[in-house]
A protein has these predicted regions:
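Gram-negative outer-membrane beta-barrel transporters
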Residues: 254, 517, 530, 626-645, ...
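Short acidic/polar hinge/loop motifs at secondary-structure boundaries
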Residues: 181, 196-223, 275, 647
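Transmembrane beta-barrel wall of Gram-negative outer-membrane proteins
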Residues: 265-300, 304-351, 383-394, 451, ...
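Membrane-embedded beta-barrel scaffold of Gram-negative outer-membrane proteins
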Residues: 390-392, 400-418, 568-570, 576-588, ...
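Face-selective signature of the C-terminal outer-membrane beta-barrel domain
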Residues: 330-344, 380-541, 568-570, 629-634, ...
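A beta-strand signature from Gram-negative outer-membrane beta-barrel systems
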Residues: 211-254, 811
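C-terminal beta-signal and adjacent terminal beta-strands/loops
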Residues: 635, 729-736, 759-812
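Extracytoplasmic beta-strand/coil segments of soluble accessory domains associated
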Residues: 99-102, 126, 160-197, 217
C-alpha cells in the first residue's frame, strides 16, 4: 500500500489508535455528519475527520469527481455511499472501521497493483498549509485525535507530558507549568490553536499550558524547521485544533478524578468537569463548551509533597476555568464563515512555598523542600482570551481560499524570586508578570495549475502585531528573610520590560507537483519583514543609582527570505523515500535584551539579528510486512546565530553558531485480529555550538535531550475493552564542559517511566477510563530538574510518584 505522509499519518494514527482507543463500533454506529458539496477527495477527507474511520482509495479515483452535500446521522458506510452516489464508485468494508473505495464492479484487491498508488483519507485542518491531497510530504509528523489524546491524558498530568511521551524528537517535559527546555529536535516549537499562534516575542514558555486538553479535537506535530506560518518553528510546529461546530445536535459530559497513591488525602485530590455541546440549525452551526478543573498537590515516590517550582512556576493547588463557543454560517455550498471565542483562566491558591535554605547545600544533593505558611496574595496565573474569525470559499476563480483574523489577550504571573544578587533586576525580591495583546491575520489560497490536476500553487500572506510589557511587584526583603521565605509584603511596582511593539508581515508561495505515481516534488519561498520598537525607559539596573539614566527608545527592522525544496520517491507501493531542505525563522527576542539593558544600551548595536536555520532531512516511511508500519528520519540543522541565551539571570547574554544532527525511528505493529499491538520509537541527537573565540562544544541539556526510547503494548480482548502499557526512557548524559557544572550543564542520570491505561465502552454512549501514571512508583528526577534551572536545590524537584486517574464520559 502506498501512503504519502498525510496518508501515513492517518494510517499510523489509526493503526496505533486501534490499540490506543476503544473504537468498538465506529463502523456500525451512526455518527453526526455535516459535509458541504465539495470535490470528492476533500469530502472523503472531511468524513474521515468527523467519523474517525480509515478510508483507502486510489489517488486517481477522486480526480474530476464532486460529492454532494451530506448532513444528518449515518453510519460511516452509509455516509460514504451517499458521497459516492452517481460517481461510478462503490465502497467496500474491509472491517468495521476500514473501508475501500473502488470502481463499481471491481474487487478491493484491484487496489494492490504496481501502478495504482493508494491513499488514506486525510484528516485535514481546513486552513492547513502543511498538508496536501496532491503530493507526499517531505517531513515526519504525528497526529493525535481527540479520543486518543483523552486516553493518553490518563497516564500524564499535562499536555506537555503527553506530547513528550508520544512524539519522537521531543524532549521531556518539566512536570510543571513551563515548557522551558522542552525542545523539538533541539530547537523551538511554534504552538498554534486553530491557526492562532501562542508564541509571543518575549516567550513566557507557557504555550502548552494555555489551553485545556479537554477542549482539543486534534494535535498535529510536524517536525523540522519550517517558515510556512512565519516565525517560531525552527524545530517544528504543534498545530492544535479545538472541538468542532456543526453536525447533528449532540452533547458530551466528562468527569474525572485524580489522586496520588503515595499520599492519600484531600490535598492531593484533583478533578475535572467538562461539558460540550455542538449541532446545527439550517445553515447555522454551533459549538459551546465550558468546564472547571482543580489541580491538587503533587507527591513524590516517597509520599513527600513536591515543592513549588521557583523559577518558571507551577500549578499545584490551582483552579482552572474554561469557556468557549463557535458560531458558523454556511453562506452557500462553497462559502462558510465562523466566529470562535474562548477564555481560559488558571489561578493558583497555595499555602506552600519552597524552602530557600536548601540552596545553601551542594547543588543536586537534596530535593527541593515544600514549607507551609505561604502568605502571597497573587500567585501563579495564566489568563488567555482568543477571538478568531475564519472564512472559507471552496471556489473563488478556481482557487480555494481560507482567510483568518484573530485577537489574543494574554496575561501570566510567575512565582516570586529572590533576585537581590541580580543587578539587571534591581536587586529585589520580586514577582514578574507579562501582558501581551496580539492582532493578526492569515490568507491562504490553493490554486490548481494546468488541466491535468497534477500541479497546485499554495500561496498567501500573514500579518501579526504584538504589544507586550513585563511589570514586576517588589516585596519587602526584611519581611521575606524573617519569615524564612514565606511572607511577601508588596512595597511597589517597577517596569522590568517596557512596552514592546512588534509587527511582522510575510508572503509565501509553495508549488506542488506530482510527476507520476512514483515521484512528487514541492518547493517554495517566503519573505518576512518585521519591526520592533519601544520608548525611553529606566532599566532596573539603574533603579538603585543616585541619578538613574534612561535607555533611549528606538526601532529595529529585520527581514529574511526563506526557501524550501523536497522530493519524494515511491519505488514500490507501500514505500516512500524523501529528501528535503527547509529553512526556519525565529524573530530575535528583543524583550530579553530590553529587560537586561544597562546604561548606554543601544538597540542598533544589540544582538538582534533573527535566527535563520537550515534543515536537511532524509527519510523513509513504509510497510514492514503486512502488519507493521515504520518510519526513519535523519536530520541536520545549522544556524549562524542561535537564540539569545540568558545565563545567570541575564548577567550574560550570548549567541553562538549552532549545528544539531540526529535520527528518529518508529514502528507500529497490529495483529491480524487487532487484539494485540505493540510499537515504539527511538530518538538520538547531538547539538554543537561555537561561541565567539572558542571551539565547538556540546550544547546544554535544555536544548538537546539525551537518547529517548518509547515503547507500548496494547491488548484489546473485546471490542469494548482496551488496555495499554507504555514506557518512556531517557538515557544518562554528562553535559558538563571539562567536568565543570554550570547553567544547563550537569551530569544527568537515566530514568524510565511506565504508565498503564485501561478503557471500557459500557454502551454506545458511556465510557470509563482508568490510568496509572508511574506504575512502579519510580523515584526519579526529570531532565529539567536534574539541570537545576535555578542553579541550586530549589529547582531539584522529584517527579510525581504513582498517580491514579479515573474518568467517565457520557454522550447525550
Amino acid at each position: 500500500v502506498h501512503f504519502p505522509l498525510r496518508s501515513r499519518q492517518l494510517r499510523l494514527s489509526l493503526l496505533a489508535s486501534s490499540l490506543l482507543i476503544a473504537m468498538s463500533a465506529q463502523g456500525r454506529e451512526k455518527v453526526s455528519v455535516d459535509l458541504p458539496a465539495a470535490p470528492l477527495g476533500e469530502a472523503i477527507n472531511a468524513l474521515a475527520q468527523q467519523s474517525s474511520v480509515q478510508v483507502i482509495f486510489a489517488s486517481d479515483l477522486g480526480a474530476g469527481r464532486n460529492a454532494p452535500a451530506v448532513k444528518g446521522r449515518f453510519t460511516p458506510e452509509e455516509a460514504l455511499q451517499t458521497l459516492l452516489k452517481d460517481s461510478g464508485l462503490q465502497v467496500q468494508a474491509k472491517d468495521e472501521r476500514t473501508f475501500v473505495i473502488v470502481a463499481q464492479g471491481a474487487p478491493a484487491s484491484s487496489l494492490v497493483t504496481p501502478s495504482v498508488p493508494v491513499e488514506m483519507a486525510q484528516m485535514e485542518i481546513t486552513a492547513s498549509r502543511t498538508s496536501s491531497s496532491l503530493v507526499s510530504a517531505t517531513r515526519q509528523s504525528t497526529v493525535l485525535e481527540h479520543e486518543q489524546l483523552q486516553e493518553l491524558r490518563q497516564g500524564s498530568e499535562s499536555l506537555a507530558t503527553v506530547l513528550a511521551k508520544a512524539i519522537p524528537g521531543m524532549s521531556d517535559s518539566s512536570r510543571t507549568i513551563t515548557e522551558y527546555g522542552q525542545t523539538l529536535r533541539g530547537r523551538s516549537m511554534l504552538v498554534m490553536v486553530d491557526g492562532v499562534p501562542l508564541n509571543t516575542n518575549r516567550d513566557s514558555s507557557r504555550n502548552l499550558a494555555n489551553i485545556d486538553p479537554a477542549l482539543i479535537e486534534r494535535v498535529e506535530v510536524i517536525r523540522g524547521s519550517s517558515a510556512i506560518y512565519g516565525s517560531g518553528a525552527t524545530g517544528g510546529i504543534i498545530s492544535i485544533t479545538t472541538r468542532p461546530a456543526g453536525g447533528e445536535n449532540r452533547a458530551e459530559t466528562s468527569l474525572s478524578a485524580t489522586s496520588p497513591l503515595t499520599r492519600l488525602g484531600s490535598d492531593g485530590l484533583g478533578g475535572q468537569f467538562q461539558q460540550y455541546f455542538a449541532g446545527s440549525q439550517g445553515a447555522v452551526d454551533y459549538a459551546f463548551d465550558f468546564g472547571t478543573r482543580h489541580i491538587g498537590a503533587s507527591y513524590d515516590a516517597h509520599g513527600g509533597r513536591i515543592a513549588p517550582e521557583p523559577s518558571q512556576g507551577d500549578l499545584f493547588d490551582s483552579n482552572i476555568y474554561n469557556i468557549g463557543g463557535k458560531l458558523g454560517l454556511h453562506i452557500d455550498e462553497n462559502q462558510r464563515i465562523q466566529l470562535a471565542v474562548s477564555h481560559y483562566d488558571a489561578r493558583q491558591d497555595s499555602d506552600y512555598a519552597t524552602d530557600p535554605s536548601v540552596a545553601k547545600l551542594p547543588a543536586g544533593s537534596v530535593p527541593a523542600n515544600a514549607i507551609k505558611g505561604l502568605d502571597l496574595d497573587e500567585q501563579n496565573r495564566i489568563r488567555n482570551t482568543l477571538v478568531n474569525l475564519e472564512y472559507e470559499n471552496l471556489d473563488i476563480l478556481g482557487s480555494r481560499l481560507s482567510a483568518q483574523m484573530y485577537y489574543r489577550d494574554y496575561f501570566t504571573r510567575f512565582t516570586p524570586f529572590d533576585a537581590r544578587a541580580v543587578a539587571t533586576r534591581g536587586g529585589n525580591v520580586d514577582q514578574i508578570m507579562q501582558n501581551s495583546e496580539v492582532f493578526g491575520s492569515r490568507l491562504t489560497l490553493r490554486t490548481p495549475l494546468g488541466e491535468s490536476g497534477s500541479t497546485e500553487l499554495v500561496w498567501g500572506g500573514d500579518y501579526n502585531q504584538e504589544r507586550s510589557d513585563m511589570p514586576l511587584d517588589v516585596f519587602d526583603p526584611a519581611v521575606y528573610d524573617a519569615s524564612g521565605g514565606l511572607v511577601f509584603d508588596k512595597t511597589g511596582k517597577l517596569t522590568y520590560m517596557p512596552p514592546l511593539r512588534t509587527r511582522s508581515a510575510g508572503a509565501f508561495a509553495q508549488l506542488q507537483h506530482r510527476f507520476d505515481e512514483h515521484w512528487s516534488v514541492d518547493g517554495g519561498l517566503r519573505y518576512e519583514y518585521s519591526t520592533a520598537e519601544f520608548d525611553d525607559f529606566v532599566p532596573l539596573s539603574e533603579s538603585t543609582a543616585a541619578s538613574p539614566v534612561a535607555v533611549k527608545g528606538g526601532e529595529v527592522h529585520y527581514d529574511a527570505l526563506l526557501s524550501n525544496l523536497g522530493i519524494v520517491y515511491s519505488p514500490v507501493l507501500g514505500q516512500e523515500i524523501y529528501a528535503s531542505f527547509s529553512q526556519g525563522f525565529q524573530l530575535p527576542d528583543v524583550g530579553i535584551q530590553l529587560r537586561n539593558a544597562r546604561r548606554g544600551f543601544d538597540i542598533g548595536a544589540s544582538n538582534l539579528e533573527p535566527v535563520k536555520t537550515n534543515n536537511y532531512e532524509l527519510g523513509w516511511r513504509g510497510e514492514l510486512g503486512s502488519n507493521t508500519l515504520g518510519t526513519l528520519a535523519l536530520f541536520y540543522t545549522t544556524s549562524k546565530l542561535g537564540d539569545v541565551q540568558s545565563f545567570n539571570n541575564g548577567l550574560i547574554l550570548t549567541r553562538t553558531k549552532e549545528r544539531i544532527y540526529g535520527a528518529e525511528a518508529s514502528a507500529d505493529w497490529l495483529s491480524d485480529d487487532a487484539v494485540w499491538g505493540a510499537g515504539g520509537s527511538a530518538t538520538w541527537m547531538r547539538g554543537r555550538e561555537k561561541p565567539d573565540g572558542k571551539g565547538w562544544q556540546d550544547m546544554t541539556g535544555y536544548r538537546v535531550p539525551p537518547l529517548k526510547l518509547t515503547a507500548y503494548v496494547q491488548y484489546k480482548p473485546t471490542l469494548e475493552w482496551s488496555n495499554r502499557l507504555q514506557a518512556t526512557f531517557f538515557d544518562a548524559k554528562d553535559y558538563r564542559l571539562d567536568g565543570v557544572d554550570s547553567f544547563g550543564r550537569h551530569q544527568v542520570s537515566s530514568y524510565t517511566t511506565v504508565d498503564l491505561v485501561s478503557q471500557y465502552q459500557i454502551s454506545a454512549d458511556d465510557k470509563v477510563s482508568v490510568g496509572i501514571q508511574n506504575l512502579f512508583n519510580r523515584d526519579y528526577y526529570p531532565l529539567y530538574s536534574q539541570l537545576l534551572r535555578n542553579n541550586n536545590n530549589t529547582s531539584h524537584l522529584p517527579a510525581p510518584g504513582t498517580v491514579l486517574t479515573a474518568s467517565y464520559t457520557h454522550n447525550w
